[in-house]
Every structure is written in structure tokens, then in C-alpha cells.
Amino acid sequence: IALILVCWSVLSQAAQTDVEGRADKRRPIWIMGHMVNAIAQIDEFVNLGANSIETDVSFDDNANPEYTYHGVPCDCGRSCLKWENFNDFLKGLRSATTPGNAKYQAKLILVVFDLKTGSLYDNQANEAGKKLAKNLLKHYWNNGNNGGRAYIVLSIPDLNHYPLIKGFKDQLTHDGHPELMDKVGHDFSGNDAIGDVGNAYKKAGISGHVWQSDGITNCLLRGLDRVKQAIANRDSGNGFINKVYYWTVDKRATTRDALDAGVDGVMTNYPDVITDVLNESAYKNKFRVASYEDNPWETFKK
């Protein structure tokens, strides 16, 4: 009887925890570690509180993804020159996001690839998408066999490079893994007019899985006007945006302003600063750090 009571108690607590988790009405927040371009930085940023990272991807003249590299200039207070070969970084990232791996970081649930397509001609965008997909499929998703589990956002700086999205999707389909597009989202990062961004997605045939970024280097100031426009689109009921993130946010006051505006993600050089603000009395009952169970393509409903 005692054993039965103990089992019942454990089951009751588990059920209560599950109900409480589903009943949590706080907005999930993605704390996005900025400019994570060396494998060693993955652990560094996650250990500081990031549940997602942003990684720069440079391309060679033939539209092959080549390095995880930003270069000069970059954010104030950061080294701009850390890098890896792209495929080596993907392997390190796979280790960090594959359950059971010795390097596994359970908190790391989303990766934004900041695609530096400015070096490419417009007519290379589709090919860049195909080559990016082939590399991710082999080195990150392990050809669909127990690869990394993180969600991926393809962030494109130029609206004219929307064919990259189709190239990426077509390549995964060609290689027999169209289901992996369930793990892929999209972002145009050039701070273009929201309407123009929407038109680019129409041309690309994309509806859903849309993150909208807004921001500027931490060396400069930028207001929240466009962030609020993106949030209005997200919350309109008929907009194309699912999530909004703001970059680069390093100060507590800026973090509070972004949270007050209603963002879903904050990209930062200092994840611990964002974590501290989320734990403040004014925010801890409204926001929480997103977990893997939070769908990054789902528009949060209050």
C-alpha cells in the first residue's frame, strides 16, 4: 500500500507540473547569443543564459557557404575575427544539439544563420540556398539520421535574394528530406519596410515560420518604431509575421523597452543581462525563457 501511495504521489505531482506548464500564460522569450562564430563560443553563450544563437555565414565566389565569420566592423566590445570552416561549425553545433551527445546543451533550441549574401550576385541566391541545404543536411542533420534537433532560421539581408529560400527547400526535397523544412524558419534582416518584406515572402511562396528582425549594431542607437510595426503585423490576425526579435540589446534599459513592446526574442552579446531582467519582479510573471516545447513558428496568443 505504501508503494502504491508513493507511486500515486509521484504521478499526481507529474500531472500537476504538466498542467501548470501548459497553463503558463507567460510569453516565451528566445535569448539569442549574438555573433557565435567559433565552436567554443556555443558553450560560452549557452552557459551565460542563451537558449538560441546567431551565427554568421560567409560565401565564396561560387555561392558555397564557406566560413562562420563576421569580420570588421562588428559590435562594440566584441572580437570580430573569430571563425570556423562552416561544415566544422555545423558538426560542433550538431554535437551541442543532439540528445545523448557528451557535448549536448539541452537549452540550445534555435539557431539563426545570418547569411552574408551581400558578396553574391542576385542570380546566385537560388544556388546558395541549394548548397546551404546540402551542407546542413549532411553535417547538421546527419542525413536525417539523429542529427541536431535545434530549429533553424535562415536570415537573409537582401529582399532580392528571396530565391535562396526556394533553392534551399528544393534541395531538401530533391535529397528526400522535405520534412526537415518543418524545422526551418525565415527572416529578412535588412530593416526594410514591413510591406516590402511581405511582398518578398509572397514571391518566395512562403507563409508561416516567419521571424522578423529589427535592429542595429550596439554602437548606435535605434528606436522601436519598426519593431512596433512588426508586432502590430504579428498581432493583427492576418499578418505574415509569427515572431519578432530585436538586436543588438546589451543594456538592461533597452531590454526592458523591448520586452514592454512585446518582442519574442532579444539578440544580445550579454545573455546574462537579459536573464537578469527576465527575473525582475516586473517581468518574471509576464515572460519566461523559451524551451524546446515552445513552437518557434507559432504566434503567441495572450
Swiss-Prot record:
Signal peptide (residue range): 1-14
EC number: 4.6.1.-
Disulfide bonds: C74-C80, C76-C219
The entry's keywords: Cytolysis, Dermonecrotic toxin, Disulfide bond, Glycoprotein, Hemolysis, Lipid degradation, Lipid metabolism, Lyase, Magnesium, Metal-binding, Secreted, Signal, Toxin, Zymogen
Cofactor binding: number and manner: Binds 1 Mg(2+) ion per subunit.
Binding site for Mg(2+): E54, D56, D114
Catalytic residues of the enzyme: H34, H70 (nucleophile)
Primary location: secreted
Keyword Transferase in record: no
Protein name: Dermonecrotic toxin LiSicTox-alphaIA2bii
